A protein has these predicted regions:
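Catalytic alpha/beta core domains of metabolic enzymes, predominantly
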Residues: 130-133, 138-285
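Alpha-helix-loop-beta-strand connector modules within alpha/beta enzyme cores
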Residues: 59-80, 113-125, 185-196, 280-282
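Active-site mouth loops of central-metabolism enzymes
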Residues: 18-36, 55, 74-82, 138-151, ...
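N-terminal amphipathic alpha-helix/helix-capping segment at the start of soluble metabolic enzymes
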Residues: 1-26, 119, 282
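Hydrophobic or amphipathic alpha-helical targeting/insertion segments
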Residues: 85-126
Length: 348
């Protein structure tokens, strides 16, 4: 069962409570390239991104935040490290949320300056703890970025913001070690009702990043923890968005758009099952209809294994059996089985 947290409004998206888990990504174009950031932001929005993070290393870079915000209709988060004045500049241009890293934002007076700016404009703050940049005194206490160390860092800054009479808060507590990250989120979720942004940081190259994020983010969601997610990949941010939705699908969250399933094939396969599955998925990109499509390798187990699919085919030599909701309907034959199958999908 999902652990319900308090609601926080980020621009036109509300997280927490019973609201859907929001998928987030972060632009990776150099901040000086405003045109490139705007173009990438538009691609992320088209891919379905719901919350978009943009780095802001200095106050002058707030102009990039402003340009991106004016170009898209999704909330923009300013990612702030070291320079608290960058956060102040982003608040001035109307950013929708500010992320601060407790490990490098500076002393309490600087945090208060950020809080005051956000309070005036009703801008939420994400306390973004990262296992790679914990405060020195906390690392000295625990000897490593343990779950307990990360939770202590997060809660200290939560209490600090609360001391300044600010509770418009989101928390993340990321680590590159999946078991450590998961335990940290468990401990944190048990002691706070602020919404949680879940992710595995520095997850690695594309393939390993997918695996670690699938395990870490998916595992947390299955335990009912998580209100917004980001899949951190060494790839274009649009790929992070796609992966985020796939994780939500995999753990049973309702997601708009088709899901294509296929079997791994074996020696019984007599038609290009994998190629057809990949092409079906490609052709259905951008489709918002929530359907499950199955492309199975043979008629022995195909219809049974995919009985929960809305529509599917199970192939043989030069033909494929079309089935809908697990029931065989007719045979597709000839050299254009794929096109015939797509026609049937579009009829649904």
């Amino acid at each position: 069962m999902r652990q319900l947290k308090r609601e926080v409004k980020i621009g036109n998206v509300t997280i927490g409570g019973k609201n859907p888990v929001a998928v987030q990504t972060m632009l990776n174009v150099p901040v000086e390239d405003i045109e490139g950031n705007v173009a990438q932001a538009k691609r992320c929005e088209a891919a379905g991104c719901q919350i978009l993070c943009v780095t802001c290393p200095s106050p002058a870079d707030a102009k990039c935040i402003e340009a991106v915000k004016n170009a898209v209709n999704i909330p923009i988060v300013a990612d702030i490290h070291f320079d608290y004045k960058a956060a102040l500049a982003c608040a001035d241009v109307g950013v929708d949320k500010i992320r601060i890293n407790p490990g490098n934002i500076g002393d309490d007076d600087r945090v208060k300056a950020v809080v005051d700016a956000c309070q005036r404009k009703n801008i939420p703050i994400r306390i973004g703890v990262n296992g790679g940049s914990l405060e020195k005194h906390i690392l000295a206490k625990y000897g490593a970025p343990t779950p307990e160390a990360m939770v202590e860092s997060a809660l200290y800054h939560v209490r600090l913001l609360e001391k300044f009479d600010f509770n418009n808060i989101v928390i993340s507590i990321k680590n590159s070690n999946v078991p450590r990250m998961m335990e940290a989120y468990r401990q944190l979720s048990a002691v706070t009702d602020y919404p949680l942004h879940v992710g595995v940081t520095e997850a690695g190259t594309y393939q390993m990043g997918l695996l670690k994020s699938g395990m870490g983010i998916g595992g947390m969601l299955l335990e009912g923890i998580g209100d917004t997610i980001r899949v951190s990949l060494a790839a274009e941010p649009e790929k992070e968005v796609e992966a985020g939705y796939n994780i939500l699908r995999a753990v049973g969250f309702p997601v708009a758009g088709p899901e294509v399933i296929t079997c791994p094939t074996c020696g019984r396969t007599q038609y290009p099952c994998t190629e057809i599955a990949n092409e079906v998925e490609k052709r259905l990109q951008g489709c918002k209809k929530s359907i499950k499509v199955a492309v199975m390798g043979c008629v022995v187990n195909g219809p049974g294994e995919a009985r929960e699919a809305d529509i599917g085919i199970a192939g043989g030599k030069g033909e494929a059996v079309l089935f809908i909701h697990g029931k065989p309907i007719k045979k597709l034959t000839g050299d254009n089985i794929l096109d015939q199958f797509m026609d049937e999908i579009y009829k649904l």
